[in-house]
Amino acid sequence: MNVFDRYAPFIQDFIYQNSWESLRAVQVAAGDAVFNTDCNVLLCASTASGKTEAAFFPILTLFTEDMPSSVGAIYIGPLKALINDQFMRLNDLCREADIPVWHWHGDVSQSHKNKLLKNPSGILQITPESLEALLLHKHSYVARLFGDLRFIVIDEVHSLMRGDRGGQTLCLIERLMRLSGSKPRIIGLSATVGDPESAGRLLSECSGRRTVIPKIEAGGVKWRLSMEHFYIDGDGGYEKEHEGEALPELDIATDKAPRNADPGMGYIFEHTRGKKCLVFVNSREECEAVTTTLRRYCEERNEPDRFLIHHGNLSAAYRETAEAVMKDEQQFKTTVTTATLELGIDIGRLERAFQIDAPFTVSSFLQRMGRTGRRGLPPEMWFVMREEQPEARAMLPATVPWTLLQGIALVQLYTEERWVEPQRMDKYPYSLLYHQTMATLASCGEASPAALASKVLSLSTFKQVSQEDYRLLLRHLLSTDQIQRTDEGGLIVGLAGERQVNNFKFYAVFQENEEYTVRSHSQELGTIVMPPPPGEKIAIAGHVWIVEEVDHKRKLVYCDLVKGKVPAYFGQCPGDINTKVLERMRQVLIEDKGYPYLMKNAVARLSEARKTAHNSGLTERPLINLGGDMWCLFPWLGSYAFLAMERFLKLKCAKELGISALDPSRPYFIQFKMKAGEKEFFDVLANEAAKEFDPMELVYKGEVPLFEKYDEFLPDELVRKGFAYGVLDIDGMKSRIHTWTKNSD
């Protein structure tokens, strides 16, 4: 029996009503795996390929044949907005079969949640943080809620398979299974899993089931891709004749930027009017600055505002307004956004995406590109690379267009190799260990040290953590009143621990700044960190406001709307760039080939950079003398191997080589003063790298590198160990030094 015939009649009717001519490859593959095996399933297919329906069509079919006696399926999504969107899509489908769909997160009313608690059934949509809260506060309900749980669907699994948030998701699944007594199958969905086999193993480890990864033939997809370069302080009117060479059918300007506009911003302004577009940026700070600039251009041109804003610090009302406008087929507006619209929220028929500078990963590039190209249109991305004009006497590193090279490298890695970054899980997730220890103890009330260790260390995420490390943690938590010992010898949450566990921010394991809610009269605008004093200006929600009052006790900022332009600040999160990206950037400088998506300014800038690289030898010789005792090292390493190299130079080699004034620009180059010469530099590095040394030796004396949210509650020894063994890529650093040694022989 083919997959379509196996579907329940109401799903077949849904397919007919939507005029689908055939099932997509991912839907056939998913149906076969769900219907004909009892394994987990990892579905890897392009954005907008129908993965959500592929997972739920067979699940709903099985439910109609044998209805679960509790919640039958959990859908875990990384964003509330994604859950809200999927809630609308699934509700229409499930209404036909009388299968309820529930969603549970911070913006959902308590009455909706109470209905689920009284009548556990159907499908529950939830974020990892809300699932944590549910297990913590509704501990006694879990067996009744999920006793007959059959499936857990993890959407955008790549975004939940890295760092502490990924580890938390896996821990939650295991804890849920233990508490409920259920053995659900896991279905992971993603467009950009870099290493499917590794992701499959993680799903298997936390569920005790084998994971199958169907081979899905990807159909040929055409992209519309362009990349242009601008100097930030260049002339306002970039040369119009430079347009149209790469993408002539796309490049007709529909507006005119004001005189003396920032060239890159003007380019975006002129090519978005009358269209539905997204403009992606890499930080919330930049999101505010770009939106404010583009809105100011509308004002100067006496045009109505046509720009929206969407990022994680905005209030739900602002975000949902932007989403609703983007879905409205009659409104042609452009939304400036961060990663919050990178994931699969349905925001309608988008014509074009812009990316200001390069994203940090191939995965992010593909997700952002994939927001367009739906409903019959090809995916379309315009890169806008911006750079400060190098001064005439600038040193070599400042003359290299790093973001342009990075953008080209990301595109080439995927088009040439179909390469995407593998997921990176922390080897020693001690911050998460604290979090799960406190969550486990808070939910069960009291446990003996042995029982607590058994519950927590048996979670697959902590398989590398030793009993000795855990004893060290528990002793420290006792000494800091995070936990207490009862008269009977058991452990309970202590007074200091209660302050953490009872705070709503405890449910999340990702790092948060101390945020202040910003209000103007009765309107909530969003949140900022480190508010300026009254009388100063802030940028939020794409407008400029003057601060009238700051209430530090209640974390509130009151302000009024004004005109002007100020930088916005929300706290920046530097990206994790893979070594393979840096190596491909080097290759871009070496190879003598063009790329069809480069526009004329970008072609000229790349040509100039290649000449600079050739004349200086920076792609052939990693160490370049900048004059006198100033040197620059170009290691072409990713973020964590670069960090290891930087510390290795300071702590292992600086004394012998006479290195001082070391100044890194991560992860591109390291400038420093050095008394030694080039040969001695490489000899010393090779000798030191050949020695066996403890990674802890690359932690500075007295340093306690707090990287993760709960590191502050750990003993210093574990923080240092987690950083040295889990963050620093010492193997990658040593491998690069070995390559230099081999090439010099």
Which role does the model predict for each range below?
Residues 13, 380, 501, 513, ...:
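Terminal, basic amphipathic appendages of nucleotide-handling enzymes
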Residues 602, 607-613, 619-650, 672:
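C-terminal helical accessory/scaffold domains
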Residues 342-343, 358, 367, 372-373, ...:
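Gly/lys/ser-thr-rich phosphate-binding loops in alpha/beta enzymes
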Residues 418-544, 549-550, 626-640, 654-664:
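C-terminal accessory/connector segments of nucleic-acid motor ATPases
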Residues 232-235, 497-504, 565-568, 676-682:
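Short, charged/polar, Gly/Pro-enriched secondary-structure boundary elements
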Residues 2-16, 22-25, 29-49, 54-132, ...:
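Helicase motor core with emphasis on the C-terminal RecA-like subdomain
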Residues 362-364, 375-403, 426-427, 457, ...:
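Long C-terminal interaction/binding lobes of large macromolecular proteins
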Residues 284-285, 341-342, 359-360, 388-389, ...:
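Short, glycine-/Ser/Thr-/acidic-enriched flexible segments
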